[in-house]
């Protein structure tokens, strides 16, 4: 997702990940799988879910699949629909390839990108290149906190960012309160606050969208 400010770029930045299991180059290397399902709320009202599945061994290649589906309703009428699916391949903490397809209330966007040697090339929708290691908005990866640029999977733009600590605060996850540590992603639009448990697991996200409305992710 691009950084929040306008609804589409925000949701774009928030949504970026894949669903294929990567085969490790090292046959004896353990392969692990992690999965996250987030309940998504707009101004406290549930609008859908965003699911992530990460497969593979970090030392070889990992694949992340991200699937989101949101519907915003008023008086039972669907005013806005959003669907997003992204598949990312990772080598260590660097993005090796990305393919994303987004339907933002009827407007469809496809993004594809690939790392080639020391260069990262975005081939669609608009060609763009960057040198060195590039990450997407990979909230699950602790290396995100040290980045100064991130790939927006909906627009295909590589965005300059600044990431700062927020400290600790209680976070409501369903009926329980969890001690959470936050990090804020500053970018071209409104900031995104990302929350982690004491064990370092990604458990939540807060951002402002159109009209000052608050979009929240909470781990289920």
Question: Model regions: which residues?
Answer:
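Acidic, serine/threonine-rich low-complexity disordered tracts
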Residues: 24-117, 122-126, 132-220
């Amino acid at each position: 997702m691009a950084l929040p400010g306008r609804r589409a770029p925000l949701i774009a930045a928030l949504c970026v990940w894949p669903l294929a299991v990567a085969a490790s180059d090292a046959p004896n290397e353990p392969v692990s799988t992690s999965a996250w399902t987030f309940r998504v709320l707009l101004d406290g009202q549930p609008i859908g879910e965003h699911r992530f599945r990460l497969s593979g061994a970090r030392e070889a290649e990992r694949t992340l699949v991200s699937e989101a589906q949101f519907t915003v309703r008023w008086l039972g009428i669907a005013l806005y629909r959003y669907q997003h699916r992204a598949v990312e391949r990772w080598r260590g903490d660097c993005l090796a390839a990305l393919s994303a397809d987004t339907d933002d209330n009827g407007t469809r966007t496809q993004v594809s990108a690939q790392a080639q040697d020391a260069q990262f090339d975005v081939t669609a929708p608009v060609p763009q290149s960057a040198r060195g290691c590039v990450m997407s908005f990979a909230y699950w990866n602790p290396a995100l906190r040290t980045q100064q640029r991130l790939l927006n999977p909906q627009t295909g733009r590589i965005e300059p960012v600044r990431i700062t600590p927020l400290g600790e605060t209680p976070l409501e996850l369903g009926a329980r309160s969890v001690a959470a540590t936050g990090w804020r992603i500053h970018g071209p639009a409104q900031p995104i606050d990302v929350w982690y448990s004491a064990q370092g697991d990604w458990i939540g996200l807060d951002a402002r969208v159109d009209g000052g409305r608050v979009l929240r992710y909470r781990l289920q």
